[in-house]
Amino acid sequence: MIKAIEGIITKKEPTNVWIKTLSGVSYGISISLFTSASLQKGEKVELFITQVIREDANLLYGFIKESEQRIFEMLLKVNGIGASTAMAVCSSLGPDEFSIAVMNGDDAVLRRVPGIGPKTARTLIAQLSDAKFGEINSMPSYQNEAFMALESLGFKRDRISKVLNECSSNDTASLIKEALKKLA
């Protein structure tokens, strides 16, 4: 199974890239819009790869961040979610936004993704609510600590996330103080 590909981008479209490796083999790889935004034709890159083997095709999905790849792979395990819907989620929501929406049960955020209606959003929340997003979440550790402290004080997750994004402190104690002022 292919887990990563390193090479030069020879062709780039919004959701696809062609990477030529040192051995001369070129791979066509589907990518999210977030990954696409950070890639340029002609540059050397390494993408984390998820390989999906179907009866009629062998598909490669590439991600610049491992956290985005983990979200994609989690989504593939949800009943009724295929690779194209999982890629639509990765193109519409960043790993942090997705994990917070699932943890908060916020189906409105999930319904913004093309191809996800109310029923699919509820299914995603139900099946992923116990998922371990801590390793996916890319917030710095001081923000995670502040998040957990504020949550233990009874504040709602969505409100905490919004306030923490507005704060400028770079250590746990200062961040909690700043957030409490805004939450009050």
Swiss-Prot record:
Record's function text: The RuvA-RuvB-RuvC complex processes Holliday junction (HJ) DNA during genetic recombination and DNA repair, while the RuvA-RuvB complex plays an important role in the rescue of blocked DNA replication forks via replication fork reversal (RFR). RuvA specifically binds to HJ cruciform DNA, conferring on it an open structure. The RuvB hexamer acts as an ATP-dependent pump, pulling dsDNA into and through the RuvAB complex. HJ branch migration allows RuvC to scan DNA until it finds its consensus sequence, where it cleaves and resolves the cruciform DNA.
Q: Does the keyword Mitochondrion apply?
A: no
Family, as annotated:
Belongs to the RuvA family.
Q: How does it assemble?
A: Homotetramer. Forms an RuvA(8)-RuvB(12)-Holliday junction (HJ) complex. HJ DNA is sandwiched between 2 RuvA tetramers; dsDNA enters through RuvA and exits via RuvB. An RuvB hexamer assembles on each DNA strand where it exits the tetramer. Each RuvB hexamer is contacted by two RuvA subunits (via domain III) on 2 adjacent RuvB subunits; this complex drives branch migration. In the full resolvosome a probable DNA-RuvA(4)-RuvB(12)-RuvC(2) complex forms which resolves the HJ.
The region called Flexible linker is annotated at 137
From the Swiss-Prot or TrEMBL record, give the protein name: Holliday junction branch migration complex subunit RuvA
Instruction: List, alphabetically, the NCBIfam families matched.
Output: ruvA
User: What Pfam family is a match, any one?
Assistant: RuvA_N
Record's comment describing the protein's domains: Has three domains with a flexible linker between the domains II and III and assumes an 'L' shape. Domain III is highly mobile and contacts RuvB.
- Region feature Domain I, mapped onto this chain: 1-64
Write one Gene Ontology MF term: ATP binding
